[in-house]
Amino acid sequence: MKTVIIEYSTIIPNVLKKIITNAFPTAICTWKDLDEDYFEFTVFGVLDLAMLEDVIAEYM
């Protein structure tokens, strides 16, 4: 499991979910609003966390 906080101006959650599920077909993504500028994004079901971090790092 990996949880990060991302700014909406960087990427929206639905697009990030699509990118991650294309790269990791077993991934399950959830998110929740923190405020109008940020959301908390969590990914489950990915074994290669280093590669997942590389993908997410582009949007943090």
What are these language model-derived features?
Residues 1-3, 36-40:
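A generic structural signal for beta-strand entry/edge sites
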